Amino acid sequence: MRIVVIGAGGIGGWLGARLAASGQQVGFLVHDRTLAALRSSGLTLCDCSRGEPGFVTARIEMPLASEDPQALTETLEGQPDLVLVTTKVDALAPLAPALRVLTGPGTGVVSTQNGISAPGLLADAVGREHVLPGVARVYSAVASPGEVRTIGGAGSLALGEWDGAATARSRAAVQALEAAGIRAWIPGSIWAELWRKVSFVVVQGALGAAANAPIGVLRSDLRDAFTRAVSEVVAVAAALGHDLATDAAPDPVAEALRMADAQPAGATTSMQRDIAVGLPSELDAQLGALCRAGDEVGVPTPVLDLAHSVLAPREAVARAGA
């Protein structure tokens, strides 16, 4: 399978290293320091579940990497079967020209970003018929350009067609991911799966950033606010036609609380960490989009709105100084 991974950070490095190590034809669309690192030192994926430095789970000595999408397609001898888009949401609109170069008639373009915004932005670039909304779950981070560390196992990626159809390309993508040691599946509704993640990760990031607190504080001192915020997300999703209940977890709010209770007490989200150090974050793409969705369907989201009101001025300052 010909695969292009856009980005080689925590998500892109994890996916790309595993897929390349399993024998897939993988190219990375990257820039600047990451491009230089991949070309000079390769790509290393380490499992640090038992502490650093961890052990190497995938090592790609000479990965195919370029900042030119046309060069990647030529080296791969054709447009990719699959494009895994792993950059932050802010990068998606500027990526549109590159995505159009990479996307052939049968190419699937997979989103991996947190929040509800990414699939629509990708559809604006290449059309809904190419977009496979994805839900990535892994604890990963960049130790340095070209070196990615994971904690807690190989991770997972759910994906599906925009319209829910069962297709050969989505099944082929799942097979390639499974062969690379990544748990992958096509859920009954990829949109419900996306909203399930939003109900936990975006709430954790929003309340955690507003309170400057890790999950250990949110699930104890701020448990009531956390519960109400999750309930708001579940209600918005339901108004949009997405039932977040499953056979294994019939109460999605209780399931989010169970997940919160299972996290390491010091856990934070990437959006939360960006806000904490004054960097531009995905606040609008994650929390802002969620609040707007509530407004559009007439579902009140007072806890989420309050968190957004607290954080929006900080985000404006961060972007003004960027």
Regions found by a protein language model. Give the residues of each.
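Short, charged/polar "capping" segments at the starts of alpha-helices
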Residues: 34-37, 119-120, 167
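N-terminal glycine-rich dinucleotide-binding loop that anchors FAD/FMN and/or NAD(P) in oxidoreductases
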Residues: 43-65, 201
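Internal alpha-helical scaffold of NAD(P)-dependent oxidoreductase catalytic cores
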Residues: 101-102, 121-130, 145-203, 207-248
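NAD(P)-dependent Rossmann-like dehydrogenase/reductase catalytic/cofactor-binding core
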Residues: 227-322
